[in-house]
Amino acid sequence: GVVVESVATLRDAGQTYALYLPTSYTPSKRWPVLYCFDPLGRGAVPVKLYGEAAERFGWVVVGSNNSRNGPVAASLEAARAMFEDTAARISVDARRVYATGFSGGARQSILIDRLCRHCLAGVIAAGAGYPTTFRPSAPVTFALFGAAGTDDFNFPEMKALDAEMSRLGATHRFESFDGGHAWPPPGLAAAAVEWMELQAVRAGLRPKDEAFAARVWGRRLAEARGLEEASNSYAAYRAFESLAADFRGLRDVSEAEGRCAALGASKEVKAALRDEAEQTGRQSRLAAQLFELAERRRGEFESRAQAAADFRGIVEGLRAKAKAEADTGERRVARRTLGQVTAHFYEAAANLRRQHARPPEVVAALEVASEVAPHSPQIFYELAVAHAANSDKRRSLAALRKASELGFKDADALEKEPALEPLRGEAEYRRLVEEMRVK
């Protein structure tokens, strides 16, 4: 009934995971298990997120503290260690093994199903879908619940994946939430677990439970009707569509199918679908334009200044639109584009560093990321590390100071970072470390 944030595996004490066992847990029966993958290796974050739903439905939740964005082999080894250890110590229902992840963790969850020869009953993918190395193909053997924030730069990818799952005849559902590139909120996380329970009933992985099915059906039908009555036609259309798909074969879904068809033919829904597609196109064009300008900034000397000015102009315009109070398509496109460009250059810098690229290349990528996301403490910390590796103490200390001002407070990370060794004797470095320790 409590989250244990670090459990060391029996075979390797360096491999740890966060763990939640429901209060009703007993080794005398087999339990569904949800394996979680956070892109920063914060196993407790998703375990806490899914804890309430796990308690309600009787699931074990496990989150790796070692798996993270970066080298795939290391993350897969972390997953293997976690799988083997929990299989040895916890009574797991092998037919009901699930995985969830956010961003790169979502891609890893789907990759694991491929590598374990389809051992997963379901995947809850937040903020990203399939790995870039392969595409979905029939039959999709696991149930897929996709989620993305309306401001997430990967929102178009998740919508496209949902459509692809439909074409492949897969068991799937997609839900959006207010927010950006992040884990879903607790309510949606609970809805995903509830949906997996419903799919388990449909697939014969758990006993038929008419009371459970009736309860979920009644609540979701009322929600869909409420959306339609409130003239939220597109949300109602999506709600009736998923309701019909989820309960087909369990209940009479003719009302849901009828309302979905009627709403789908309405001007409001057609306009919403058209606007959604246009948002995707605008994001793609803007991101491509910014990538091209960023490349030109490193090109011929004569064109650098103009490219830099054009880049700044577009970014400043997007930033202004991103601050708008109203949730409009224009605001969503601005936020998604800024997020996409930031992530692109931040991840490029991380890859360059892992490949032991020349420090100036890492600095260049992070400078672009910091220009697009000037309020990110993590980016300025990474920029400080890159400047130090490039033997530039002055710029490194300036970036560290900015990171601290923005809220960076992981003094231990500074002290453990080898690239910052040349700064250890600097008075300002010591002052920044002490300030971080008291934050």
Model-derived features with residue positions:
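Residue at a conserved register position within TPR or TPR-like alpha-solenoid repeats
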Residues: 227, 352-353, 387
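Structural register within alpha-helical repeat arrays
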Residues: 223, 243, 260, 348-349, ...
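Short beta-strand element of the alpha/beta-hydrolase
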Residues: 29-40
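A domain-start/cap signature at the N-terminus of enzymes
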Residues: 1-31, 75, 220, 272, ...
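Gly/Ser-rich "nucleophile elbow"/oxyanion-hole loop immediately N-terminal to the catalytic nucleophile
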Residues: 23-30, 72-106, 114-117
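Short beta-strand/loop motif that positions the catalytic acidic residue
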Residues: 145-148
